[in-house]
Amino acid sequence: PYKDTTREFQWKKMKERLSLLESIQKEPFQWAILQNYKNRNGEAPLVKVFKRDAYKRVSDTLGVERYQSVPLYLLTDTVIPEIYGRDGSLVRIKAMDEDSKFARIQTVYDGEEEWYAPKKYIKQIGDTVVFDKAIFVDRHNQNIATLEHVGSKWLVRSMNPATTGQHRPPYAQETPLGMYVLQEKKSRMIYLVDGSKETGGFAPYANRF
């Protein structure tokens, strides 16, 4: 129990996602991460159909914001992107032509769809990487669980309460659903007071997906 709510760990959903993680590794693939943290690789072009979300930011029809995202193009049209891919998302590389500025990729979370993405937004991580650790963030129950694959079993390494993002425009945003690769570890992560550049505090031993 926590205040007026009861938190629980959704083991059934975790089991389903662990099965997915195992299944995508049964055959060797060239893996990659979509990267555009803080638009470091360039602001993504406007998609064909866009809107302003509750934060007054440009987003695609699926609600993915343009800011720090990666433009994804239909296989039949590399002029204007169709949707945005989230920074940190795990993808497969299906084709990488040296003479093209695009790579053909395939998503692995919530459907296997193929897209073209500009190479400058893609970080290759090879075909020998093994995903044997998983961190589950539960937005509803506000908790986090870490598991490790040892032998033929997934072992629970930690279970803790966690404060995830909340949908509170114009500043606070909910943690987006998806399958992300750990990109950065920090001894401390500084956060700001909403709507200002004033430091609000820090979180120790933070991981950025």
Residue ranges and their predicted role:
Residues 2-40, 44, 83-123:
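SH3/SH3-like beta-barrel superfamily modules
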Residues 43-68:
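Short beta-strand/loop turn elements enriched in aromatics
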Residues 61-64, 94, 205-209:
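Short, intrinsically disordered, charge-balanced linker/junction segments flanking boundaries
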Residues 65-77, 125:
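Short, structured beta-strand/loop micro-motifs enriched in basic residues and often containing a Trp
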Residues 66-67, 98-101, 137-143:
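A short, compositionally biased
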Residues 79-85, 171-172:
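Short, surface-exposed secondary-structure edge patches
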Residues 119-209:
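Gly/Pro-biased beta-strand-loop elements
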